[in-house]
């Protein structure tokens, strides 16, 4: 099922999914020429191989626990914690527990 992107000025619900997390999938919430916001939904143990994004990013853990591997070590994020990565910074992601997060991507590279 395709998810609709929110329009400018529209309120987006980002509360924890709780027991319903396993029924949800990763999807873009907002996408514009300069910015993309994605709700990451990661079952426990799910990993994203090392990759990089041209622009800067932030990852805000909404629920659960996520490891972000950057600069050779893991940074553990719990609910309410955020990490910023510079443009082109190689990183990998792994869900320690079932988790959801808000990924913000600046699509305009420096």
Each language-model region and where it sits:
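Short acidic-glycine-tyrosine-enriched beta hairpin
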Residues: 72-87
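Short, conserved beta-strand element in jelly-roll/cupin
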Residues: 41, 52-67
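A short, N-terminal "cap"/entry segment at the start of jelly-roll beta-barrel domains
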Residues: 1-34, 69
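A cytosolic small-molecule/anion-sensing beta-strand core signal
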Residues: 62-63, 78-79, 97
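Conserved short histidine dyad/triad with adjacent acidic residue
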Residues: 23, 36-53
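Ligand-binding loop in jelly-roll beta-barrel domains
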Residues: 87-110
């Amino acid at each position: 099922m395709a998810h609709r992107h929110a329009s400018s000025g529209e309120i987006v619900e980002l509360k924890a999914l709780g027991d319903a997390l396993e029924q949800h999938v990763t999807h873009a919430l907002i996408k514009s020429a300069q910015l993309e916001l994605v709700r990451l939904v990661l079952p426990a143990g799910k990993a994203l191989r090392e990759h990089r994004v041209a622009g800067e990013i932030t990852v805000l853990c909404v629920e659960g626990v996520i490891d972000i591997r950057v600069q050779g070590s893991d940074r553990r994020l719990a609910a309410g914690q955020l990490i910023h990565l510079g443009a082109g910074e190689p990183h990998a992601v792994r869900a320690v527990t079932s988790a959801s997060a808000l990924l913000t991507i600046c699509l305009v590279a420096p």
